[in-house]
Amino acid sequence: MNQLNTEKKYDVIIVGAGPAGLSFACSLIDLNLKVLVVDKSNEESISNPKPDGRETALTHNSLKILQKLGVWDLIDPTSVSPLKEAKVFDGDSDSLLNFAAKKSSIGALGYLVPNNLIRQAL
């Protein structure tokens, strides 16, 4: 009995349809590559993600990547919050690193954006 060859060939397979995986996939669009994104979620929940309370802290470089991909303008600016201060703790240690935008020449260390809005824009 002949079996149909249903094997498909891809140049790049990306595991995970979160902001990083989808950004990477978008960055490959103009390179004429066959790209497959694999995720445990179904296509509907990836293309229309529901709010789940998670937020992503974007650095200035991450913001530049989203701008270059043409997706930053698709995110509602009223949902974006500037990250003015960050504190880093080390387990049970009393050590603490504190970063504050007010002590630097930049207005914000980065930006907090609802995860679903980033995924939706991508």
Region annotations inferred by a language model:
Residues 4-20, 36:
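Beta1/beta-strand and adjacent pyrophosphate-binding region of the FAD-binding site
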Residues 9, 81-122:
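Conserved N-terminal helical subregion
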Residues 13, 26-54:
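Glycine-rich FAD pyrophosphate-binding loop
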Residues 16, 39, 90:
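Short beta-strand/turn micro-motifs composed of small residues
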Residues 23:
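Short alpha-helical segment within the catalytic ATP-binding CA
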Residues 26, 64, 120:
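Surface-exposed charge patches
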Residues 42-46, 68, 104:
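Beta1-alpha1 glycine-rich phosphate/pyrophosphate-binding loop at the start
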Residues 50-91:
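N-terminal FAD cofactor-binding segment of flavoenzymes
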